[in-house]
């Protein structure tokens, strides 16, 4: 993994299964689970903000849960903040989660805070120190969100 890559995925395929940390048997998953995402390949570098936008059921949350080690990576190579998702031990999960920030669209937000403050807390918790840079980055993300919301659907 390159030094600038915070996230690197190669050939990642994600299945929905009722047993996310159970058997690594692909055959079992194919019999029990539904294919969600296939052959993902991408890098996210340090300092980049990334949006996952797609239809309901397209695999956005499954991908985030895999990156956040809530779902186990079964197929492909995945590295997050220097951790190999295929070899991640349970005791390493909190360390991984302290190194990245993921904001879910709904159920995992701090309900007594607005979107700005949810993003702010993630950035502070992951080591961002410069207040003006934090505010600038969050403002950029929020402006992109408002542009997306204000565009008519086709």
Predicted region positions:
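Conserved beta-strand
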Residues: 9-12, 24-45, 76
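ABC-type ATPase nucleotide-binding domains, specifically the catalytic core motifs of the NBD
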Residues: 17-20, 120-133, 144
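The feature captures the beta-strand-to-loop junction immediately N-terminal to the Walker
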Residues: 53-55
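Helix-to-loop junction immediately C-terminal to a conserved catalytic motif
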Residues: 68
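Conserved ABC transporter NBD signature motif
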Residues: 76-84
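Conserved ABC ATPase "signature" region
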Residues: 83-84, 132-150
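ABC ATPase NBD coupling module
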Residues: 85-101, 131
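Short coil-to-helix segment of the ABC ATPase nucleotide-binding domain corresponding to the Q-loop/switch region
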Residues: 112-121
């Amino acid at each position: 993994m390159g030094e600038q890559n915070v996230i690197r995925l190669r050939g990642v395929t994600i299945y929905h299964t009722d047993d996310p940390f159970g058997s690594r048997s692909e055959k079992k998953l194919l019999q029990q689970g539904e294919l969600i995402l296939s052959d993902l390949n991408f890098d996210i570098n340090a300092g980049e903000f990334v949006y996952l936008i797609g239809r309901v059921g397209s695999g956005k949350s499954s991908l985030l849960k895999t990156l956040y080690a809530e779902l186990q990576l079964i197929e492909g190579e995945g590295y997050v903040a220097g951790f190999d998702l295929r070899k991640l031990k349970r005791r390493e999960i909190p360390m991984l989660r302290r190194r990245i920030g993921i904001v879910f669209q709904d159920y995992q937000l701090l309900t007594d805070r607005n979107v700005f403050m949810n993003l702010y807390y993630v950035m502070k918790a992951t080591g961002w120190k410069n207040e003006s840079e934090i505010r600038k980055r969050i403002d950029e993300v929020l402006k992109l969100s408002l542009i997306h919301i204000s565009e008519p659907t086709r």
